[in-house]
């Protein structure tokens, strides 16, 4: 594991166009009532290449509990201020399981991002989440 981390750091140091972002998690909309829509939290996202990035952080989830997340993201479209991608990773802090796999599409324009997370349980909800993505380097 430490070799993998060292390789990632080495590769990210070699890429001059890589950027790091502060993620400010903030709000969500659910298609069913009873869920928390104020999802404050912070995260870090780092570009590994023109199309690949990794991210991790914490937020207050839709069940009013603390969650940590980590994911890899592939940006399949980057033009002007648009950045469209697909992310795959894992999240903690939900009642359903201690760690839940996740995959979601995300659309960013300038600093504003929106993601869509589909319902995973019959009694759950589809959710659209919103956050800011601010360059810090």
What are these regions (language model features)?
Residues 22-30, 52-61, 82-94, 105-107, ...:
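Transmembrane beta-strand segments that form the barrel wall of outer-membrane beta-barrel proteins
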Residues 12-15:
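N-terminal signal peptide c-region/cleavage motif recognized by signal peptidases
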Residues 39-48, 66-79, 99-111, 126-137:
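Feature captures outer-membrane beta-barrel proteins of Gram-negative bacteria and organelles
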Residues 1-4:
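Positively charged n-region of N-terminal signal peptides that target proteins for export
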Residues 17-60, 67-69, 133-137:
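Short glycine/proline- and aromatic-enriched beta-strand/turn motifs that initiate or cap beta-hairpins
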Residues 34-36, 62-64, 96-99, 122-124:
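Short sequence motifs at beta-strands and strand-loop junctions characteristic
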